[in-house]
Amino acid sequence: MSLSRRIFLGSSIGTVLPAVAPKSRVVVARDPKARALDLLDRAMQSFFDRNSPAEAWRQCIRPGERVGLKVNCLAGRGGSTSLALVEAVCERLQQAGVKPGNIVIWYRLNEDLDRAGFRLSTASGKIRCLGNDVLGYESELSVFGSVGSLVAKTLTQQCDAVINLPVLKDHGIVGVTMALKNMFGAIHNPNKYHPHAGDPYVADVNALPEIRRKIRLTICDGTTAQYEGGPTYMPQWNWPFGGLLVAQDPVALDTVGWRIIEQKRTEKGMKPLKEMQREPAYIATAASRGLGVNDPARIERLEV
């Protein structure tokens, strides 16, 4: 990977950063003409520095594991995780040794998945696709900080690892909805945690042990992104970003994604989210909880 393709956020030319300071890599792969599978391969191979898709996937998923794909389907067709991306992830997981019956695509409700174009299935031995309403939630409350929630059984009982598949978009209450906010779909009471622009609630949901220990990777779908009016689908505020964001650090990914959305808002003559009283301060709170880094100097943004 050439140095010309690497951007160290917040660092200046000539700055030598201490070798002991860990950096979180966020790959931003863009090509509006590329197939989802090709763009995914480029992003994954770049993120893990591997020569083949299978090698890349084996860095985060083991063949015998049960893998959950946490999509975002609230906006229906057009504003949800794309079918093409999910199909590409499923294909590569299987090539990396994960059995079809060990893959489950999930979201809050069957109805949401159906509206977004996903084919519901609970068939044994095949890729499953189901809402939390199928298996329900654990009976014991999970608590961290400001949050007390029941966690979806799909996550706790059907997944050894989770690939988080949010969408790159604005959120009318909490500012942005990407890696961190997408995990509201894993709890029974997400509507309770939107006050104060989601701070500290979004961070604390992600700090719940059942969630924190299972998230292996985030692949943020920026094929079509949205800079205003989210989380519902508002085509007048969409733009063809034509890319994917990949990271294992959800805080770093949200930091980069937030910057992308703010840049587009500036281009369109819109006020920054802070002036709209919905700055996503929960990102910094998540960093303080040890969920990742939001310091630009500790984020390696890799454009491919």
Residue ranges, per PLM feature:
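N-terminal and secondary-structure boundary signal
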Residues: 2-304
